[in-house]
C-alpha cells in the first residue's frame, strides 16, 4: 500500500539544456536587443459573464514586457547556475534609436564589436518580450467567497550569437505563464485585493527572464522520492538508516529483504527502494533495472493478466502507477546522460 511509504527529498539532479556549447566558451554577455518602442498596453477588453454564478468578469490586455527587468533576471539566473566562468549584463537597449517597433537580430559586425567591448565569447540577446494578461473575478460557491485572479502569459524571444557566425546560433521563442490570486467577500473586494498592475508587470518580466534559462544551460531540479518503510523488520530498520543518511546499510537490508521472500508485494517494495538507492548513487542504469523489476512485481500483485496499460485504474493499482511514473523518469534521465556529460565536460565530469 502507498500508506507504507514515507516521503523524502533527494538531492537535486542536473538536467541537460537544449543547447550545447563548446567548453572553450566560458564568458557570456546577456544583452537587451529589444526595440525601445513606447509601451503598447491596450485598454483591457472587459466582458461580463452570462453565467454570473461562476465567472463575474473577464478582462484581457496585451503589453510589451519590461526588457531591462527581464534581461537582468535572465543574467542573474544564468549566473546562479554556475555554468559559465563569467556572466556580463548589458541591459541598456541596443536599439534605443529605433522609431518603429521591430524585431531585428544583431549583425555579425555588431556581435563582434559587443564581444570585444564586453570581453566575452558569446552573446545571449533578449530580442522581444510580449505579455497577454487575463484578469478574472469568479464566485467560488464551495467557499462562499469571490476570487480575483490574474494569469499573465509571457512570450520571450532569445537569440544566441557567436562572433564567428553570420547568423544566430539559435533563436528560441517560448511561452509560459505566471498566476496570482486573492479573495474577498464581494467581487469589488476580490478585484481590489489582487496584485497592483505595476507590481504584476515587474514580476511577470522577472519571470519571463528566467523562462529561457533551462534551454540554454543545465539546471538543477529538486526531486521527491518515496520509499517503502513497512512490511518486515529489515524494511523498518532500513528506514532508520535512511534517516541517518546511511544508505549503504539501508541497501544491505533491502537486498536481504528482497532475497529472503517469495512474496511479490514484499519483493516489489524492496526492489523499488533499491532503485532509489542506486539513483542516489548516480548509478542510473542499475536504478532503471531495479525499478523495472519493481514494476514487474507490482503488475503481478495489482493487475489482472493482459491488462491494457491505458485502462489502469490508479485507485486499484496505486503502486504500479507510481512505480511506472518513476521508471519513466529514470529512463528519461538515462537517455539524457550522454548529452549531460557532453555539456558538463568543461568541468571534467565533476558534477
Feature map (PLM): residue ranges:
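Single conserved hydrophobic/aromatic residue that forms the stacking wall/gate
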Residues: 1-10
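Post-signal peptide N-terminal segment of mature Sec-exported envelope proteins
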Residues: 13-33
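Active-site charged/polar residues at nucleotide-handling catalytic sites that mediate phosphoryl
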Residues: 23, 117-121, 245
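Short hydrophobic beta-strand segments
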Residues: 27-37, 226-229
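N-terminal segment of the mature soluble domain
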Residues: 32-125, 165-170, 303, 310-351
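Long, contiguous interaction/recruitment modules in multidomain scaffold/adaptor proteins
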Residues: 66-78, 84-230
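Alpha-helical protein-protein interaction scaffolds
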Residues: 231-351
Amino acid at each position: 500500500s502507498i500508506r507504507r511509504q514515507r516521503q523524502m527529498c533527494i538531492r537535486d539532479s542536473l538536467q541537460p539544456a537544449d543547447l550545447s556549447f563548446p567548453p572553450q566558451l566560458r564568458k557570456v554577455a546577456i544583452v537587451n536587443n529589444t526595440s525601445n518602442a513606447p509601451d503598447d498596453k491596450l485598454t483591457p477588453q472587459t466582458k461580463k459573464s452570462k453565467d454570473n454564478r461562476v465567472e463575474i468578469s473577464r478582462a484581457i490586455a496585451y503589453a510589451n514586457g519590461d526588457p531591462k527587468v527581464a534581461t537582468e533576471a535572465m543574467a542573474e539566473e544564468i549566473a546562479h547556475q554556475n555554468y559559465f566562468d563569467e556572466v556580463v549584463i548589458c541591459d541598456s537597449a541596443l536599439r534605443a534609436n529605433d522609431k518603429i517597433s521591430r524585431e531585428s537580430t544583431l549583425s555579425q559586425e555588431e556581435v563582434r564589436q559587443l564581444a570585444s567591448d564586453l570581453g566575452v565569447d558569446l552573446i545571449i540577446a533578449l530580442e522581444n518580450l510580449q505579455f497577454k494578461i487575463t484578469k478574472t473575478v469568479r464566485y467560488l460557491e464551495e467557499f462562499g467567497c469571490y476570487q480575483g485572479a490574474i494569469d499573465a502569459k509571457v512570450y520571450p524571444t532569445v537569440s544566441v550569437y557567436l562572433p564567428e557566425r553570420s547568423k544566430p546560433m539559435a533563436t528560441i521563442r517560448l511561452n509560459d505563464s505566471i498566476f496570482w490570486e486573492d479573495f474577498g467577500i464581494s467581487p469589488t473586494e476580490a478585484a481590489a485585493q489582487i496584485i497592483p498592475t505595476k507590481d504584476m508587470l515587474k514580476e511577470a518580466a522577472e519571470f519571463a527572464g528566467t523562462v529561457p534559462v533551462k534551454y540554454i544551460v543545465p539546471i538543477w531540479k529538486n526531486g521527491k522520492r518515496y520509499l517503502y518503510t513497512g512490511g518486515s523488520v529489515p524494511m523498518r530498520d532500513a528506514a532508520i538508516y535512511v534517516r541517518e543518511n546511511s544508505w549503504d546499510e539501508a541497501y544491505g537490508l533491502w537486498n536481504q529483504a528482497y532475497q529472503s521472500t517469495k512474496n511479490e508485494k514484499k519483493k516489489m517494495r524492496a526492489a523499488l527502494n533499491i532503485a532509489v538507492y542506486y539513483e542516489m548513487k548516480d548509478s542510473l542504469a542499475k536504478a532503471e533495472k531495479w525499478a523495472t523489476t519493481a514494476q514487474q512485481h507490482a503488475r503481478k500483485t495489482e493487475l489482472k493478466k493482459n491488462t491494457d496499460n491505458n485502462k489502469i485504474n490508479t485507485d486499484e493499482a496505486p503502486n504500479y502507477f507510481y512505480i511506472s511514473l518513476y521508471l519513466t523518469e529514470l529512463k528519461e534521465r538515462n537517455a539524457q546522460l550522454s548529452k549531460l556529460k557532453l555539456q558538463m565536460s568543461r568541468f571534467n565530469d565533476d558534477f
